[in-house]
């Protein structure tokens, strides 16, 4: 039985985004006041991210026959992340050099308002490699859950899963309790997702109301260039990877269409994380693979953010007439290979990493961030959408490599078929 169009989450979120854009454009003051609706929805999602990751990873690892399989999955995932994110960085670098959206602007860095980006520059000072690694280790277990730090929760969940697995039959009771708790958490997610249209409406109304459509026109060449690059990356790079793995990127995008709309409305790929964990498992990827790849990907496999970082850095160099020869660009690439891994899937994190990168490279003016401060919020949608698709594709690829992918389940889900061969409407 097909779900009514008006009852589908896809239609509701799309309608809410459209209404939010109209309200923000025609009544900007009212639109700005809608910010709490978007913030509230994202906070509700963040509230359950830590327990979702913990339950998924622990039950996935504890339920595996061999611990070697977990190590193999992690190694394959990290290798994939490094290769694909490097490709994303290089593509961004090539496109921005060909199009040169900042050429001819002739901006004097001394005339830019450095105070506007001072907060980001200060936060960027703590983005070093050692600081990043140390930040993965929580000061306390409770602190990891309280702060919602994905990597800290993931580290504890992996250790807990290993320890529970070693207990064998003695740990069965704990395993059953965590599985039951997981079902309760996903029940909460279903309730929260009913508020997705309200959250998307509030976030979009605020964005358009505060920054205005005029901001899109100003510096529009960079925005258009970035969006086209992200689309090309998804279609050509991720599309080729998907084809080699045995599925269609377009069918996969259709499968996660509701999650993409939620991300479009909130500009944060993190807002779709809980549902992605569930959907990737339903797609045929083993729970242990999903639990490791998706959360880790939110720090190590942000393809959209990688494209953004190279394009934004070179754009600032072009606009301020700063020297960017081949040596400088290779240096930039090497720095970004490290600094880009510190960007979480939340709004604004890419901007902080960009500030850290400009500081590390040295010869690029950090004050140049002021050039893109006004349009960064509009570029975050493309970043978040590309990040989400990239992590979804990564999960399927890794699951296939480690032989933990149910190909029939994948084919049935992407072709909208029930196990008996009958078509059905994807659940929302």
UniProtKB/Swiss-Prot annotation:
<keyword id="KW-0812">Transmembrane</keyword>
<keyword id="KW-0997">Cell inner membrane</keyword>
<dbReference type="GO" id="GO:0015138">
    <property type="term" value="F:fumarate transmembrane transporter activity"/>
</dbReference>
<dbReference type="InterPro" id="IPR018107">
    <property type="entry name" value="Na-dicarboxylate_symporter_CS"/>
</dbReference>
<dbReference type="InterPro" id="IPR001991">
    <property type="entry name" value="Na-dicarboxylate_symporter"/>
</dbReference>
<comment type="similarity">
    <text>Belongs to the dicarboxylate/amino acid:cation symporter (DAACS) (TC 2.A.23) family.</text>
</comment>
<feature type="transmembrane region" description="Helical">
    <location>
        <begin position="184"/>
        <end position="206"/>
    </location>
</feature>
<comment type="function">
    <text>Responsible for the aerobic transport of the dicarboxylates fumarate and malate and to a lesser extent succinate, from the periplasm across the inner membrane.</text>
</comment>
<keyword id="KW-0472">Membrane</keyword>
<keyword id="KW-1133">Transmembrane helix</keyword>
<feature type="transmembrane region" description="Helical">
    <location>
        <begin position="5"/>
        <end position="27"/>
    </location>
</feature>
<feature type="transmembrane region" description="Helical">
    <location>
        <begin position="219"/>
        <end position="241"/>
    </location>
</feature>
<dbReference type="InterPro" id="IPR036458">
    <property type="entry name" value="Na:dicarbo_symporter_sf"/>
</dbReference>
<dbReference type="GO" id="GO:0015366">
    <property type="term" value="F:malate:proton symporter activity"/>
</dbReference>
<keyword id="KW-0769">Symport</keyword>
<dbReference type="GO" id="GO:0005886">
    <property type="term" value="C:plasma membrane"/>
</dbReference>
<dbReference type="InterPro" id="IPR023954">
    <property type="entry name" value="C4_dicarb_transport"/>
</dbReference>
<feature type="transmembrane region" description="Helical">
    <location>
        <begin position="47"/>
        <end position="64"/>
    </location>
</feature>
<feature type="transmembrane region" description="Helical">
    <location>
        <begin position="352"/>
        <end position="374"/>
    </location>
</feature>
<feature type="transmembrane region" description="Helical">
    <location>
        <begin position="77"/>
        <end position="99"/>
    </location>
</feature>
<dbReference type="GO" id="GO:0070778">
    <property type="term" value="P:L-aspartate transmembrane transport"/>
</dbReference>
<keyword id="KW-1003">Cell membrane</keyword>
<protein>
    <recommendedName>
        <fullName>Aerobic C4-dicarboxylate transport protein</fullName>
    </recommendedName>
</protein>
<dbReference type="Pfam" id="PF00375">
    <property type="entry name" value="SDF"/>
</dbReference>
<keyword id="KW-0813">Transport</keyword>
<feature type="transmembrane region" description="Helical">
    <location>
        <begin position="141"/>
        <end position="163"/>
    </location>
</feature>
<feature type="transmembrane region" description="Helical">
    <location>
        <begin position="326"/>
        <end position="348"/>
    </location>
</feature>
<dbReference type="GO" id="GO:0015141">
    <property type="term" value="F:succinate transmembrane transporter activity"/>
</dbReference>
